[in-house]
Amino acid sequence: MKILVDTNVILDVLCNRPEFVEASSKVWKYCEVDQIEGYISALSVPNIVYILRKELTPQKTEQLIQQITMIFKVVDLKSTDLKAAAEMFSSDYEDALQMCQASRIKA
């Protein structure tokens, strides 16, 4: 099974968000042990760095990004995704982008 993991699922684990960490950790673990083929959007990486840099040292942030990109494949962001997301008229453009990327990779 192939899934595109939302940025917030990654942040739930890294930031230990009490209400979501258990479920998000399961998704992370399934991807880590290759029970699920996990992908993240290229857009997720700078967003994760932006959040983590407020809490962690640059070195720790770099280590976590390396770990994330070893576990999850990164889906590039294409101009077709940008256009398709804009046409979705979603209230959350970032979510619309991720839906377009997921559709493109058949996740």
Predicted regions and their residues:
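Short, well-structured N-terminal submotif of metal-dependent ribonuclease cores
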Residues: M1-I40, R53-Q63
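Conserved glycosyltransferase catalytic-site signature
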Residues: T7, A42, S79, D95-M99
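Acidic catalytic patch
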Residues: N16, L43-S44, L64-F89
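Short active-site oxyanion
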Residues: Q35-G38, I71-K73, K106-A107
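Acidic, metal-associated active-site segment
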Residues: Y93-A107
